[in-house]
Amino acid sequence: MIDLKLLRDNPQEFSDRLAKRGKFDLQPILDLDRQQRELEVERSQLQARSNAIAKQIGEKMKSGNKSDPALEGLRAEAGQIKTTLAELEPKEKQLKDELEQQLLLIPNLPSDSTPVGKDEAENVEVRRWGEEYIPKSKDILPHWEMGEKLGILNFERSVKIAQSRFATLIGAGAALERALIQFMLDRHTSAGYLEVLPPFLINSTSLTATGQLPKFAEESFKCEADDLWLAPTAEVPVTNLYRDEILTAENLPIYHCAYTPCFRREAGSYGRDTRGLIRLHQFNKVELVKLVHPSTSEQEHEALVRDASAILEALQLPYRVIELCTGDLGFSAAKCYDLEVWLPSAGCYREISSCSNFYDFQARRGKIRFKESGQKGTQFVHTLNGSGLAVGRTMAAILENYQQPDGSVRIPPVLQPYLGRETL
């Protein structure tokens, strides 16, 4: 959530920064904030007058002036104030609720270091790693064809079980998926991340804290009877472990890694990536989540990108790092790097990880704070997260980049101990 005080004190500066992301009308928020504060002042003044009247009545009663004509007037005024305060209470609550709902729809301010641009065409390439294999003809099968040829992927039967955009992994395919998950978790825990296995069903409050609700409700699957949602990413349950808590500065930084299946409706992607493992309603992912001191969040963000990149390098998969421009940032992010892996069958890079720094945006929504030793008050932590990695897309990259002339797929050396074999 945005800092309302910052908006109130510097509306033009705030508006200019937000305009780098697109058009947003902040006037309704400023109007609601003004009305709410006016009601607060009125209530405060009435309460002060009520207290003064009560004191006057008490003094007159104590002095024995129970028949003082002024008492009747004071009691009448006190009654009127009580009625007015009772009328103000629902109005104030309504304004507060409306203001909060409006604030929840405003995205995070972009970092000053985020490149300014309208859309993904203006994203900035930071670096590349590895050598891209460019097929001379059709000697590289798309991963879905290779998977079906090897008998390890089945999409047709998945449609029968569920609908389109689901996949069934069979035999060595299921084993490769498990191996990738375990390999990723092993690497991240060795790097200092504490593993978490959270609930896969989450409530609306959790999704609101991390920014998926209320704006992106149509992107997630909901269990209507229980107000529970299927987790779109482990970022949500892991970050919410600390919702409504006050940590100590000594607790920071906190590093977590988590494997979860992820569920997304992909409502805005009709007609895109209709085949294969790239865009599914259900997919596995290993997520990295950090809660850090604000003074270190920029360094922690760069380290997060390195930790996610290390998995691709260990698997010897060519990739590039893209810094997203302001017009392509996710709703909650202030700064974001995407890792894109090379898919030779398409001759292009595809996103496999998104590493975001949210600053205090999520912490403000989720009330995740910390206290410095010996200091008064609390501060909001900074939260970060990144995929480490999307497992299905990693499998797709392996099935394409490791194809052999004899029609087999070589297993990356670091995965061979997990599978006990060298090829698929």
Swiss-Prot record:
Residues in coiled coil: none
CDD domains, per the entry: SerRS_core
Binding site for L-serine: 233-235, 287, 387
Pathway note: Aminoacyl-tRNA biosynthesis; selenocysteinyl-tRNA(Sec) biosynthesis; L-seryl-tRNA(Sec) from L-serine and tRNA(Sec): step 1/1
Cellular component, GO annotation: cytoplasm
Origin superkingdom: Bacteria
Top-level EC class: ligase
EC number: 6.1.1.11
Keywords for this protein: Aminoacyl-tRNA synthetase, ATP-binding, Cytoplasm, Ligase, Nucleotide-binding, Protein biosynthesis
Any one biological process term the GO annotation gives: seryl-tRNA aminoacylation
Reaction equation(s) it catalyzes: tRNA(Ser) + L-serine + ATP = L-seryl-tRNA(Ser) + AMP + diphosphate + H(+); tRNA(Sec) + L-serine + ATP = L-seryl-tRNA(Sec) + AMP + diphosphate + H(+)
UniProt xrefs under Pfam families: Seryl_tRNA_N (PF02403), tRNA-synt_2b (PF00587)
Function statement: Catalyzes the attachment of serine to tRNA(Ser). Is also able to aminoacylate tRNA(Sec) with serine, to form the misacylated tRNA L-seryl-tRNA(Sec), which will be further converted into selenocysteinyl-tRNA(Sec).
Similarity remark: Belongs to the class-II aminoacyl-tRNA synthetase family. Type-1 seryl-tRNA synthetase subfamily.
Assembly and oligomerization: Homodimer. The tRNA molecule binds across the dimer.
Name under which the protein is recorded: Serine--tRNA ligase
The organism of origin for this protein: Cyanothece sp. (strain PCC 7425 / ATCC 29141)
